[in-house]
Structure formats: C-alpha cells, structure tokens
Amino acid sequence: GLGDVYKRQIPFCAKRCLYCDFFSNTDMKFKEPYIDAAIREMELRQEYIGGEPLDTIYFGGGTPSQLQQVDFERIFEAADRLFGTSSCTEITLEANPDDMTPEYVASLRNLPFNRISMGVQSFKEKDLRFLNRRHDREQALRAVGLCKENGIQNISIDLIYGLPGQTLEEWQENLDDAIRLEIPHISAYHLIYEEGTALYKLMEAGKVTPIEEDLSVTLFSTLINRLTEAGYLHYEISNFGRPGYFSRHNSSYWTGTKYIGIGPSAHSYNGESRQWNISSLPRYLQGIKAGIPDIEIEELDINTKYNDFIITGLRTMWGIRTADIRERFGEEKQTYLEQQAATYLRQGLLIRENDTLTLSKKGIFISDGIMSDLLWV
C-alpha cells in the first residue's frame, strides 16, 4: 500500500451548490469549535490506522479554502504530532476558484500544500449560474494562473457534464479550455440528481429535464477521446492525468490502503472495518466534547472485502490480478470471478492480459453492470 492516508472534511461553504448532497454548513461561527474538535478527534482516534506515518493528506469539503493560514497551521501541527507527516508525498487542498485571491494563494506558500484540486465544474457562465456556483469563468481562469505563478504546478480541476440543455459542442469547448490551460489532472463527473438536493426538487417539479441517455454516452466518449488525444491517461473511470500527475490520494482508495477521515460525515477504513462520522455538525461537536465520537461502524466480512476489491480495482486502468483474488480471498472466489467474467471476455467488454482483468474501451460504458455481475451475492 501507500502507507496511510488522512482526509479532513472541512464542512464550511459560503453558499450551497444546486446539486450538492455533501454535508456542509454556511455558518462560519462554528469554525473555531470545529477546528478544536477535529484536533481532539485526531487524538481520540490516533490508533485507528495502526501508527504508520501518513503518505497523503487531503483537505476536502465543504470548502477548505474557507480556512486561513493560521487555521491550517494548527491542523498540520496536530497531524504531525499525532500521525507523522514528514514522509507525506502529496498534500491536497480542495478549493473554490473565487477563494483563490492573490493574497490567499500567496499565503499557501507558507503551508505544506503541494497540490490544489479546484471545483471549476464548467468554464461556461450559463452552467455556473445553473449550478449556483459563486465563481465565474474569469475567476476560474485567474485562479489557475495564480496557482502556477505561485509555484503550484500540480493542479486538478473538477468538471461536470450532462447538464440540462448542454450540447456536445459546449462540452467540447469546456474540455478544450482545460487542455489549453495545461491542467495536468482532470476529474469529470456526470451530473446526478440526488434526492434531497435543490436540483432533485426542480426535476420533480418538472422545471428541469435530465438529458437523453444517448447524449450522455456521447459526452462521456468525447471526454475520453478528447483528453486521451491531448496526452492524458484515463487511469480511473472519472479521472484523467498526465504521466506523474495521478492523484496518489484517490489511488489509495482504489488500492485498499488504510485511511482515516476527520470531521463531520468523514469516512475511514483500516482493512477490517469501515467507519463514518455523524453528518450533523452540532452532534459531531457534542460527541467529541464528551470524548465519544459519534461514529457508525461496519465490520467487513470476506465477501464484502472481495466485492470492494472488485469494484475499486475494475474502475482503474490497472484492473484486477486474478492471483491477488486467490491470495486474498481463496480459490472459490477466483473460480467464481473467472466464470462470471467469461461472457464479458468473449464479448470484448473485459480484457485479460497475462493475469490481469481490465475493462475494455467498450466495457467502460457499461461498467456498473459488469461489476455487479462479478460481485459475490
């Protein structure tokens, strides 16, 4: 594995996005109590990942760029004291383009961040307005420029496609903007209508209409073709990176590395159990204050571990080694996998090279269906 991984959920946003179903809070008065609680949670859960030093740190959202240098300094000091951060290879800050002012980006030079992941979502004004984002096209372009001027080359952006009314041409222009900016890593996600979001309510009321499935497929294949032609490697279903710029942090999720998540609704995994924190900020603060973090725990049996291994492995260009299946889960599971995979191999939806199964270019389009057939039920 990659050593251990640490993820911080910073649950604050200045404004809630239309499609968002992540936990976040727009009230900054909780910021200080939250940082105190997060440091206390690290102390309480120090043993969870078994004391190995951290390999990557990821500040996720909400919007961590709502925190200031002094806030980050407190958190880094605690993480180093409790887990050891000197061997960290990648430290990522998730940021909104409109938070990336010249002063803010300059202040990051005093902190150990070496990667920025920016929630651009689109370079089109109408998309940004529809998604209820705070930034505009100009701010997104400027934010990327500021990072580069301040020596941060390792930049990732998120893009969303499949918006109501989106055309193929608009999506191509978005991708061309990203390529032209020489952004070395791009994560692209299809818009999802999650129950409970403002977007879902608009769909229910008939005010927005999801795009046709044929167009979704065309947008996805355009994404793959455009970025591959431009020199990006399609290393995970939603992720594209230039060589040397894959996200080590995300790769650790897909390779079964232990990780600890700190903060409301953060998830953790140590090979034997999955844990996730309560999403309510007041309840989270209360639990930490009492010295009893409010955590749900799922102990993982061998079948769940096998299913996790299949889902995470097949999402990547590295795929699944059948020898690993035999070694980790026994011969019965290996035989089952080979039987279940046979049809897809014949149809050219899975590829087998040496000992490794990967999705073919065609297979990527129906990956969910293929994966569910390979699972142990």
For the regions a language model picked out, list residue spans one by one.
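C-terminal scaffold of the Radical SAM
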Residues: 24-47, 52-331
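Local cysteine-cluster metal-coordination motifs and their immediate loop/turn environment
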Residues: 11-22
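Short, small-residue-biased leader/transition segments that mark boundaries at the very start
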Residues: 1-6
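Minor-groove-contacting beta-hairpin "wing" of winged helix-turn-helix DNA-binding domains
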Residues: 356-360
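A short, conserved structural fragment
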Residues: 346-355
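Short amphipathic alpha-helical interaction segments
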Residues: 331-343
